[in-house]
Amino acid sequence: MLLKYQNNASGNAPSFVRFFRVPGMNHSHGGIATDQFDALKALVNWVEYGQAPDRIIAGARGEGNASDQVNTELPSDWSANRTRPLCPYPLIARYNGQGDSELAEHFSCK
């Protein structure tokens, strides 16, 4: 429903609504995904400080990660410190072609 609204709304929809998909994540967490992120912080920054999120940084929950939960579905070759940007729909994260592919800073929302 949100996607239908966003696709059909006037051009100012991104000024008050953003939808961030998490590739590979199950319903609320887990799956082969970078499923650890703070959407509430992004929302607070938008509502209270006028800083609309253009990306949300997500991490993988794996051995060695600061999280107390371990996502057992992650591939063994993923770094526990893997990060990715979550991009507002319809944009998706694309690797820039240079730098460590485990770090969000080397990806852009396109």
What is the predicted role of each segment?
Residues 1-110:
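C-terminal His-loop and adjacent cap/lid subdomain of alpha/beta-hydrolase
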